[in-house]
Amino acid sequence: MGQKVHPIGFRLGVVKTWSSRWYAEGEYSQLLHEDIKLRNYLKKRLYHAGVAKIELERAASKAKINVYAARPGIIIGKKGAEVEALKKDLARLTDKEVFINIQEVRKPEIDAQLVAENVATQLERRVAFRRAMKKSVSMALKFGAQGIKITCSGRLGGAEMSRTEWYREGRVPLHTLRADIDYGFAEAKTTYGIIGVKVLIFKGEVLSQD
């Protein structure tokens, strides 16, 4: 049976780029763990801002963080007070000078990570999983996605046995490297256990300029 490779990892260097961009000789593992720590901290702290993606760049003892969020106003705060406090906390956490750049996600309805988190939140609020999936699918297509597939896996509806249910509309080519596929994953922590939500959104093909 064919297994599903990670859609973004599969397209790295073709139509996708890395989310951490830096070079290290001896302290590679140390910096990698620092990256993971930073991502986890930012995801937790800025959860209500709807963080879609975090990109990290490093040069010498400086770190530049690009945060893509659906609600950037929450991160920035009044007159930039929140972002300044965040900058200080991150500098304390890493012992490095940190620069933060906040970017707005214009269409959160077709951002796979935000769609996955939205479905997971609905499942935690005990919304029927089929309704949550169908609503997100119709919204994504309405906002210009060419195809979307949502998979929910776990004890759906509190069933005794865990199972996987998926819903797809439009085209979602898994093997076409030039296909711009966005991938998102989230977990819904329900009283019955964890339900995993995977979202694949096809936004069209990236054609080379030559």
UniProtKB/Swiss-Prot annotation:
Keywords: Ribonucleoprotein, Ribosomal protein, RNA-binding, rRNA-binding. This is Small ribosomal subunit protein uS3. One of its GO terms (molecular function) is mRNA binding. Coiled coil: none annotated. Binds the lower part of the 30S subunit head. Binds mRNA in the 70S ribosome, positioning it for translation. HAMAP family: Ribosomal_uS3_B (MF_01309_B). It comes from Syntrophotalea carbinolica (strain DSM 2380 / NBRC 103641 / GraBd1). PROSITE patterns: KH_TYPE_2, RIBOSOMAL_S3. One of its GO terms (biological process) is translation. Residues 38-106 form the KH type-2 domain. It holds the Pfam family Ribosomal_S3_C. Belongs to the universal ribosomal protein uS3 family. Part of the 30S ribosomal subunit. Forms a tight complex with proteins S10 and S14. Transmembrane segments: none annotated. One of its GO terms (cellular component) is cytosolic small ribosomal subunit.
